[in-house]
């Protein structure tokens, strides 16, 4: 699961970088990482299924259940990273560009999610409940939820004032949704094993 954590983090980072500056090298890297992430997901899930079939003490059974969910969260972060890559490709192929305000919002949101993901992975790796870090993670997720709502509203205003096209609007709103979901999965990961 440690390797999946590293791959999911790297894939998310690279997908964000690709969205803002598309290039074929990054695309190949993300594609390769996604294949490894998919493979690890299948292998680890298969192993966990075998373990869960054994008669385990309650605490071990709880840990296996938590790992099932965590592996799924890593996989989903990879899926959202793939969606972000596709958004970047849509922008590039359609020769679309986002307004300066929209780009600023995207960069702010991306940075917030990356910080939250790093905090969450730290908590996951240490497997120690750190009350201060847990509070920071919860606050970060709440701020991301507030930003998502605020950015959606400001984008709808831009659409109604014809300051951006419907195509740009779809890319922005999809990307915003993917970022919010990555934050949700990161929060799940942070707290997954904290009570074990």
Describe the role of every protein-language-model region.
Residues 1-196:
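Cytosolic, long alpha-helical scaffolding segments
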């Amino acid at each position: 699961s440690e390797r999946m954590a590293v791959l999911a983090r790297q894939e998310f980072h690279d997908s964000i970088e690709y969205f803002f500056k598309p290039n074929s090298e990054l695309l190949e890297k993300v594609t390769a990482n996604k294949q490894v992430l998919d493979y690890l997901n299948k292998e680890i899930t298969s192993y966990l299924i075998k373990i869960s079939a054994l008669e385990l003490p309650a605490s071990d059974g709880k840990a296996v259940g938590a790992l099932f969910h965590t592996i799924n969260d890593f996989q989903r972060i990879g899926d959202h990273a793939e969606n972000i890559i596709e958004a970047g490709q849509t922008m590039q192929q359609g020769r679309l560009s986002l307004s300066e305000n929209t780009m600023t919002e995207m960069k702010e949101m991306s940075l917030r999610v990356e910080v939250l993901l790093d905090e969450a992975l730290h908590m996951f790796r240490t497997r120690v409940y750190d009350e201060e870090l847990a509070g920071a993670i919860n606050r970060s997720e709440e701020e991301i939820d507030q930003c998502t709502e605020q950015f959606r509203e400001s984008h709808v205003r831009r659409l109604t004032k014809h300051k951006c096209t419907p195509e740009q609007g779809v890319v922005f709103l999809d990307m915003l949704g993917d970022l919010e979901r990555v934050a949700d999965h990161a929060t799940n990961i942070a707290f997954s094993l904290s009570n074990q």
